[in-house]
Each structure stands twice: as structure tokens, then as C-alpha cells.
A protein has these predicted regions:
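Alpha-helical transmembrane segments in multipass membrane proteins, preferentially the mid-helix core
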Residues: 42-48, 100-119
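Short, highly charged, low-complexity non-transmembrane loops/tails of multi-pass membrane proteins
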Residues: 230-251
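Membrane-embedded alpha-helical segments of multi-pass membrane proteins
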Residues: 31-44, 60, 73, 92-103
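Membrane-interface transmembrane-helix boundary segments in multi-pass integral membrane proteins
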Residues: 119-130, 144-221
Length: 251
């Protein structure tokens, strides 16, 4: 399992030698960093794999399984390829990476390397938001070090500018992003002070807090029930017995 993760990390950098990255320097400089959820997980999963922190392992499982399934069932990147024939290797790379972030955490649980607990499901949304801060930091360093150009005044309101993981807003005509935005409080959608006060602009990262906790938490709970339903049922019985003033029978 660890070797799959290491190979995935190597492949992330080796992709710079194949189209479209090898023929587009600007994209190569941008995408060789970890600027989306999958890329950031590719960078961190090899280190998380040997972590003794159970919340970190739970994060690996929930976000790996959920993000992997979404990417495989709705592969936005391959569908958007303008040159399908010329970029076949990158399409294969895309599917390997997203299969990997799904398969390795799943194998960890199935093979007994890690035991899930429904009580730790908040590690999924919390970990995802921390991951987005990691992505945001990557993008800031990219801009400050010259890997991507700094935004000019006209691009200040462009949600789609270098926005690969919804950090800066829901995107333009993006079904998933627009769905997430439905759960965002209105004050996270406008500029509070300054020259552009009152105009619509999503607060970077903050706009995602409510949608992530609202959506990822119940999804993680449903997934946890596949593996930890017995512990949940036992805890429900204990709680019911306590509320009724009875002591549950010990088997």
C-alpha cells in the first residue's frame, strides 16, 4: 500500500514530462505544485500512512474514499481535455491517482491496518478544511515566487482565476461549486470593507466552512456505518437504557 502512495507521489512530478505539461510551461509550473485536493492528498498520504494518529487515518479514509469516488464517477479533468488523443498518458495518470487515493485508505481498513470509529467523523470535514489551507499556502507561494502571475485589478473579481479547489469561490458555471454555495452564509459572499465594499466576492476559504461541515459530516457518517455500525448500535442501546434508567444486559 505504501509503495502505491510513493509511486503516486513520483508520478505527480513525472507528469511534467508528458503533454499537456511538457508543452505548456505555465501549466507545468502551476500543476507541479499541490494545488488541488487530489494533488495535496498525493503529497501527504505517504506521511499520513505511518501516522499513529487515528484521526489522521480516519481523514485519509473518509476524504480518500469520497473524493476518489466523486472524481472517478465525474472525471471533470479528462472530460475537459481538448486533445484526448495527445494527452492519453495524462488521462491514465489521472485515473491512477484518483484510484490510489480511494484504494489505499480502503485497503487500510479492509486489511485491518486501521479501525474506523464513527465517533471521529469530524476528522473528515476538519481535515479537509486544513488541507484547503495547505493548498492555499501552495498557491500563495506560487504567486510570490513567480510560478504563477500575480492577479491584476481586472482579475480581482474573477472566481475562476487559478481556482482549482474552490478555495477562492465556487467557480464559474460549475455545478458542484454552485451547489456548495447554496450552504454558504450570505456575509461570506460580499466584500466587507474598502473600495469594493458590498460587491459580491467570496471570502477565500471561509466560504467553504459551512458547506464542508454540512455535507461532508453526514456523508462520512454514512460511510462509517458500513464498517462501524455494530459499535454505533451498541452505543445507541446504552444511551437508550441510560435514558430509561435501565442497565443494558451484558452478553
Amino acid at each position: 500500500m505504501f509503495s502505491l502512495l510513493v509511486f503516486g507521489l513520483m508520478l505527480h512530478f513525472l507528469k511534467t514530462y508528458i503533454p499537456p505539461y511538457s508543452v505548456n510551461e505555465a501549466r507545468m509550473l502551476r500543476d507541479s505544485w499541490f494545488v488541488n485536493i487530489c494533488g495535496a492528498n498525493i503529497a501527504l498520504f505517504p506521511f499520513f500512512f505511518y501516522s499513529k494518529n487515528r484521526k489522521v487515518k480516519d481523514y485519509m479514509f473518509y476524504i480518500g474514499v469520497l473524493s476518489g469516488l466523486i472524481a472517478l464517477f465525474y472525471p471533470q479533468e479528462p472530460l475537459a481535455k481538448e486533445n484526448q488523443m495527445g494527452e492519453q498518458l495524462d488521462i491514465v495518470r489521472f485515473y491512477y491517482h484518483h484510484w490510489m487515493v480511494l484504494a489505499v485508505p480502503l485497503l487500510m481498513v479492509l486489511l485491518g491496518h486501521h479501525k474506523l470509529s464513527y465517533k471521529r467523523i469530524l476528522s473528515a470535514p476538519t481535515g479537509l478544511l486544513l488541507l484547503m489551507l495547505f493548498i492555499m499556502l501552495n498557491q500563495i507561494f506560487q504567486s510570490e515566487l513567480g510560478f504563477i502571475p500575480l492577479r491584476d485589478r481586472e482579475e480581482f473579481f474573477d472566481i475562476g482565476y487559478k481556482n482549482t479547489s474552490y478555495i477562492w469561490g465556487p467557480g464559474t458555471d460549475d455545478a458542484i461549486g454552485n451547489f456548495l454555495a447554496l450552504f454558504t452564509p450570505s456575509f461570506f459572499k460580499t466584500i466587507p470593507v474598502g473600495e469594493f465594499a458590498g460587491q459580491e466576492k467570496y471570502w477565500p476559504w471561509f466560504w467553504m466552512i459551512v458547506p464542508v461541515y454540512t455535507l461532508v459530516t453526514p456523508l462520512s457518517f454514512l460511510v462509517s456505518m458500513i464498517f462501524d455500525h455494530k459499535a454505533f448500535a451498541a452505543d445507541v442501546k446504552k444511551l437508550a437504557a441510560k435514558l430509561c434508567g435501565k442497565t443494558p444486559a451484558v452478553k
